[in-house]
Amino acid sequence: MRRSIQALTTAALAGAMLAFGSGMAVAAPAPADADVDTFSVPAAETAAATTAWTPERMEAAIPADTLVLDQIAELDTAPAPDGAATTYAADQPVLQATRVSPVSHIGKVFFTLGGLDYVCSANSVTSANGNTVSTAGHCLNEGPGDFASEFVFVPAYENGSAPYGQWPAVELVAPTQWTDGGDINYDTGFAVVASQGGRTLAATVGASGVSFNQSTGLSYTLYGYPAASPFDGETLQQCAGTASRDRIGGTTSQGVSCDMTGGSSGGPWFIGSGSGGVQNSVNSFGYNTQPGVMYGPYWGSVIQGAYQSAQG
C-alpha cells in the first residue's frame, strides 16, 4: 500500500554555532572529508528564473513532499495489535500549526524536477557570501538523482506577494549521502542565490544563525508554508515543541508535534521560541502511521560540511 507523507534560547549554546546575521563564524570548521555534492547553475538559467515564475505558475506548483514517498514508505510500519480492537467516536481536529505574520528571512522556494514544478519552504542563513538559503535536500535534489532547475527563493511570501522579490540560485549544495543515496538522515540542502541590485540576500532580509552538533531533545519553533489540506500554502505557519527521537523508522531524525502538511518541507527549525533563534534543522518528513509529528534531520558534521561548502 502506498503511504502518504505529512511533510511537511538566549542562553549560550555549546557546540558549533554561527551568530545571527553577522556573517562571523564562531563554529569549529567542518571536517575536511565531509561528502558534499555541488551543482553550478548555468548563468542563463539564473538570469531567466525570476521571470519564469509567474504568480500563476507558483500557485500551480506541487508540494515536494511527494519526492520522498519511497524513502519514508520503507520505514513507515504500523505496530502489531496487542489487545482487543476498540473504537471511540471521532472529534474534530485541533490544528497544532498556527498562522503567523510573514518573517523577512523565511520564504518559499520554487523549482523544477523531472519536468514538474514544485514548492517548498526555506530560510536565509548567515554565510560568508551573504546569499545562502537552507532547505530540505529533497527540495533541490531528487535524492538520488538530478539537481533542480529554475530554483528561486521568495522571502516573506504571503498570498502571492513577493515583497523582497525573487532570488534565483547560482549554486545548489547537498550531502552526497542525499544526492547519491537518498538517505533521509541527511535531508538538508543549501542554495546560493544571486545578489539583487548590488545587495546580498542577508543585507536585504536578514539571515538566521545556524548551529550544528547540538544535544538532542531540545525545544524548537518550526516554520513553513504547508499547502496540502487544511492549509493552502499562502501563509506562514508555526509549530513549537520539544524534539524526541524517531521510534518508528529508527532514523537519526527528531520529531516535534506539528501537523504542517506538504509544502512545509525545508522550513526552518529554530532552537527556543520564535524566529530569532539559531537554526538547527529543517522540516523533512512525517509518517502516515504517526500523524501530527514533523521530523527533521540531525544537523551534525556532514550537514555542517555542506553548509560550509555553500559559502565557497
Residue ranges with predicted function:
Residues 54, 109, 122, 135, ...:
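Terminal peptide-recognition signature
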